[in-house]
Amino acid sequence: MIKKTLKINGVERILILDKDETLVQVLRDHLLLTGCKIGCGEGHCGACNVIMNGKVTRSCIYKMSRVPDHAEITTIEGVGTLSDMHPIQVAWMAYGCAQCGFCSPGFIISAKVLLDNNPSPTREEVRDWFNKQRNLCRCTGYKPLIDATMAAAAVMRGEMTKEDLVFKQTGDSIVGTNYIRPSAAQKVTGTWDFGADDALKMPSGTLRLALTQAKVSHANILNIDTVEAESMPGVVRVITAKDIKAAGGTNKINGLVMLPKHNKTDGFERPVLCDEKIFQFGDAIAIVAADTEEHARAAAEAVKVEIEELPAYMNAMDAIAPDAAEIHPGIPNAFFETNCIKGPDFDWDSIPDSQQVEIESYCSRQPHLHLEPDCGYGYIDEDGMITVHSKSIGIHLHMPMIADGIGVPMENLRIVQNHAGGTFGYKFSPTNEALIGAAVKILERPVSLVFNQFQNITYTGKRSPAFMNIKLAADENGKLLALWGNNYVDHGPYSEFGDLLTMRLSQFTGAGYGINSIRNKSTTVFTNHAWGSAFRAYGSPQSYMGSEIAIDVLAAKMGIDPFDIREMNCYKESEGSTIPTGYPPEVYCEEELFKTARPLYEAAKKRVAEKNAASDGKIKYGIGVSLGVYGCGLDGVDTSNAFAELNPDGTVTMYAAWEDHGQGADMGVLVSSHETLRQAGIRPEQIKLVMNDTKTCPNAGPAGGSRSQVMSGNACRLAAENLVAAMKKEDGTFRTYDEMVAEGLATKYEGNWVTTFCADHPIDQDTAQGDPFATYMYTIFLPEVAVNTETGKVKVEKFTCVADVGTIMNRLLVEGNFYGGLVQGIGLALTEDFEDLNHDTSLKNCGILYPNDAPDDIELHFNETYRPSGPYGAAGCGEAPLDAPHPAILNAIYNATGARITRVPARPEKVLAALKELEK
């Protein structure tokens, strides 16, 4: 042990500690300064940044033996407080930088050191500084962070005040404004606790959990020996599948088959704890409960698992090979099939080869790369309910998925969403919920389970890769006539939502264009790679890797400008254009979208031409185009509920299970309810939020597929309308709480929104024809790239995006979602993948983008076509920026070099290979 005297946030502290502890452990575990986060644990992400003796220090890799005695350390808690914020913190709120908020403390720390030493940095210097400090953000795309730092610098130079930065409400409506999300202040001051922070603050007697996990991808389990582990220091119990079954559980996750007609599985392939087979690397085999996390992890490694290793099928094509064994005996590896059959058959021999193309494409196993590792905790609440806190974005959805598996009746199960440090969809699937719930039931003690980043990357779900074979045909003028496709989706070893995902290929391949004949077959395949989970834009990135590259190839073959061919074929009411599933879109807005985009495209072409004219040929420049369309909601009839309650003090409490990835659910509830509540004189600050607890909030459905603004937004609107209607007197004034009670009127009202109109045209499981979504989002992507022909490195220098997501409810949120989604799309196109289990196990190795990898020049334009079924005319927005940026980037590479790449990521070696092919 060593003794250290440190000045932390201005206070002298005497600490007795282990010399091998890291600084972040001391700050968090000893002092509960949880504004300092643990993301990667390897010094790659900057979430743990603190200031030590005036320098930025990555505290997760800084051993206490290296910390000088009497060092002065500042954490985010010492930068500013809720009542006295630093200008950087105010700017972070004003520019919408705190989306999930997990990275905010580390960035603010870095920005403070920069501005303390360089009060007038350029934008390039700010980006370089953040890059040097290894600051990562997965939500914002970095541009708002640079904007905020520049604004804070102006305040610190005395050129403006903090008050100048803050949004000032001028009318009684906040729709379409930059109103700051309610959680922003806590996020920028380090007081917004995430799951691992909560876990540190649980009561004494809380047991810490660790998992024994598979180290191979496919094997039979012959024996599990827990004897040695059970005798290790601090261990209370080792739980295996037999314990779950003894406690009344089936030990199976319910994968919720959504489209049963052509599904060859019942959805129960995934065990809570593996006892017979291992299906993927990282599968959980045992849960160790101990007094400390260190003891639990040591014992988890001591559990002996005897296996018979089996051939591992790591992609769909290997898994459907004739000699491939069934991963789940009795169920074919190709377990689901859907066909999009629209319009009449097309005679492909009726048109010349010059008017048709065929391509093969591959969309990769993109990892979510959220900075906060998966985490959660559980306990038995005051009513005896098994309570699980996690990052779930489907708290009501996950209850039926895990209840029988752990032997807990639904009515005795409660799920609460933690403040989540980003999910981007992976938490649509349960990850730790059943493990925590089973441990609480068996141990009857509070527990916590916190993954490290290695576990987070290797065990949680990924975007399902898709191999696509697409044909497109057009008439002599470029008018699209037909689309044919044959596609395979690699969904990993578990079926959950695989059918729904694969149906998306029917719904989005060729979307945006009035194609009268479509024959598009898609097959879902079990493999032994990471299980497929939802990822932002769910199903559409795979679809557009096929159709948006195919239309570009067709345009080039026919000598038509790629923008022109898309504009020519976009949905037009005058032509009666229909979506791939056979029905008209809810609004015809694409023509106006292309009109808005046309001058931006022409300007981009001019810039690119000028750069190429000035280049020596080593760097080649190009402009790409793509069109993306995404439907908001779950297929068919969808529903959401919310409560609005008038309180004695005249405030209103909104109860909503609108789960938050970081996209801004708190702001969504606030603006969707306030727009109605303002009629009764309720101000935004008078609206209280109770969110994301199955015990207190009605079922609103999961936060996925950009459904929340439409579904939950409407539910909040209706709840507010019902409350306001009850408050309203005949003379037009409004009752107080006391008057409501005196008149015997209820003070709490429910809002229920149901897309009953979708029941009129349900999806036909044989043809995929139907009208499944309440509303759609439309986006044109225009990236400008620079390709280094000697190294193969591609840089997106500017990204212009033109979108229509209906009424913009909060501009900060919508713009922030687009900035972040576009940069995730750049990662998908150029760098990100999870394929090699010996390499792709860290944020850095998976290809996450740092600030200098993303463009600083991102230009957003929005048309706001009113959506009849959206609250106040709004659609969703979260999926839109990531549905088709990647094919646009690949199309830009072609425009620059003539090299056509149809597989992502287009890493330098792939680009170089394509360039060399041109020389043959």
Positions of predicted regions on the chain:
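Short beta-strand elements
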Residues: 50, 186, 192, 196, ...
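C-terminal catalytic domains of large/alpha subunits in multi-subunit enzymes
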Residues: 242, 255, 407-412, 442-447, ...
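Signature of N-terminal electron-transfer/Fe-S-associated modules in redox systems
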Residues: 1-168
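Glycine-rich loop/linker segments at domain edges
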Residues: 96, 177, 183-189, 256, ...
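Flexible, low-hydrophobicity surface segments
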Residues: 154-331
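Helix-loop-helix junctions that connect adjacent transmembrane helices in secondary transporters/permeases
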Residues: 324-406, 570-651, 842-861
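Intrinsic disorder at enzyme termini
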Residues: 2, 132-195, 604-611, 645, ...
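Phosphate/diphosphate-binding loops
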Residues: 291, 445-489, 714-738
